[in-house]
Amino acid sequence: MAFNFNWSPLMADASFYTRAQDLLTAALNKSPKPPIIVDDIIVTELNLGSIPPELEILEIGDLAEDRFRGIFKMSYSGDAFLTLKTRVQANPLNTYLLTRPSFATPRPLAAATPLTIPLQITLSDFKLSGFVILVFSKQKGITVVFRNDPLESLKVSSTFDSIPFVRDFLQKEIEAQLRILFMDELPAIIHRLSLRLWVPEYRAGEELQTQTASANGEGPGQDPLASPPQDPVDALGNALNESEIESLSLDSSVETHSLFSQKNLLRLAALTDSQRTLSLFTPSIREVVYRAWTSPSDQTDASGSVTSPFFPVLSRTQSQVGSMSSFPDSASMVSSQSRSSTPSHTFSGYGLSLGAGRHSKAHARKRKKRVVDLRRPKTTDDAPSVSDESSFTESTSAPSICSAPLPVLDEQTDDPVTPPLSPDNDLHLPAIPERHRMSISRPALRRENASEMIRDTAECKPSSNAVGQAIQEEDLSATPRAAVRAHGASVLEKGKQDPDSSAGSSRQLPSTILPFINDNPTGGVVDQALVERLAGEIARRMRDEKFMASNACGPFWDRHSQEESPPPAYGH
């Protein structure tokens, strides 16, 4: 059985070639193009030649008047040619950088400048050989499937034939693309062409789609920037009038796209300058973080701090290294909030500050809420045992309220509770580490000395009524101490009227010499001998504390091992 192919009608039909060119153009641009090709591939010329292909029938599966199915062996070596036109990238470095990740490639300035060159390629001298499965039907058209790669060779002619490496590169790339074309795209192209020839419904549908596409594409394109703004300026920022705007066109040298609004340009320039200089008058923009802050409160809010500038901190701090030495009375200061009994040690400028008793001062940065109770205290039964906790304290900050919740002492009803206020005229003395030793190791000795001094006070009589103010005595010792003030005769009168409460009166000694309490001008007169006796007793205690300086810097637990008596809180 032999077949005779009439190849001449295919060469004469012009519409067939036009349709085939469109299908080939769509097929060549559908697949991923190599990076060297930077434009669409357009088929400008197509010619199937005058030599038909050679077909050898290997198998016929179905044969009828309107259908056919068979397997052929095809060989072609004819004069068909194909001409393509596109644009290529002539700079290989630009192509290399585009195909590599940005973090792994260098950043040349001028070497990677793109250079596109138009390219025309002609494909000829096709040599095909392969097995083809051919299925024909008048209702479904022709289906051609290649079982193997039919392309053996072809000739590629281009405008770069004089450059050997460019010619070889194009030859290799085009062959790779044509192999994909024959295996994937060519069967679809042949099937669509056969439907156009033998199926009228398909032809009518394609014509309708073509008319719709042409109707949508009619009319010139509208340029959104064709209408100039209300206050246009040229590229140099000079304002233009209406006559100059009318003389301009899209085809002139001065484009209308450059006519921007002068008002908007000024706003953009001001915004750019303010952002560059971090000005505080930067226009507010939504979802923008500014590096310049208008006030410190903005920084506090931005940093997420919970500290509010409207709520003052209750703890008072002092910048001096050592504050005033004092004898605070636990009966005149009441704390509304008990502190933790766990000893927390704070390092001062001269050594380890242990505070008063076992309850040391908390960390300086910790905010404390202190409340001074100005109400009259209530009488309690255990008042005589509480005043033993009065001690000599040294701290690196201002005098604070007692470090533990204490009961209230029994005092006169006409004697108000005075809050601890720091006087301005008192002497600020440096902190002495030895005094912390005495505040822990010798509480019993302080109680005995206080009892002896108050008993001597009760035996003495006032010698004169002319002295109405406190007498301050200087100590011959080098150790500094606080000023001693004379309170009124209320303590003496209280000792005479209530002999049963002599123990309670004896424990009010720190209240009489507390420097925070103002002098009472209407009180009695303290004898000069009493003041000298008190000053001598204080000087003797200071000298005793000074002799124990060798053990002041020792470990904290060694100090407890050397205690002569238990602390005030556990002495009874």
From Swiss-Prot:
Record-level GO cellular component terms: ERMES complex
GO molecular function, one term: lipid binding
Alphabetical list of InterPro entries matching this protein: Mdm34, SMP_LBD
CDD domains tied to this protein: SMP_Mdm34
Chief location of this protein within or outside the cell: mitochondrion
Protein topology in the membrane: Multi-pass membrane protein
Compositional bias of kind Basic and acidic residues: 371-381
Renumbered residue ranges of the record's region Disordered: 212-236, 321-426, 477-522, 553-572
Compositionally biased intervals (Basic residues): 358-370
Compartment list: Mitochondrion outer membrane
Domain of life: Eukaryota
Domain SMP-LTD, chain residue ranges per copy: 1-195
Polar residues composition bias: residue spans: 387-400, 500-511
Keywords from the named record: Lipid transport, Lipid-binding, Membrane, Mitochondrion, Mitochondrion outer membrane, Transmembrane, Transmembrane beta strand, Transport
Feature: compositional bias, Low complexity: 330-348
GO biological process, one term: phospholipid transport
Assembly: Component of the ER-mitochondria encounter structure (ERMES) or MDM complex, composed of mmm1, mdm10, mdm12 and mdm34.
Domain comment quoted from the record: Lacks alpha-helical transmembrane segments, suggesting that it resides in the membrane via beta-sheet conformations similar to those predicted for other outer membrane proteins and porin. The SMP-LTD domain is a barrel-like domain that can bind various types of glycerophospholipids in its interior and mediate their transfer between two adjacent bilayers.
Entry's family note: Belongs to the MDM34 family.
Annotated function: Component of the ERMES/MDM complex, which serves as a molecular tether to connect the endoplasmic reticulum (ER) and mitochondria. Components of this complex are involved in the control of mitochondrial shape and protein biogenesis, and function in nonvesicular lipid trafficking between the ER and mitochondria. Mdm34 is required for the interaction of the ER-resident membrane protein mmm1 and the outer mitochondrial membrane-resident beta-barrel protein mdm10.
Protein known as: Mitochondrial distribution and morphology protein 34
Originating organism: Aspergillus fumigatus (strain CBS 144.89 / FGSC A1163 / CEA10)
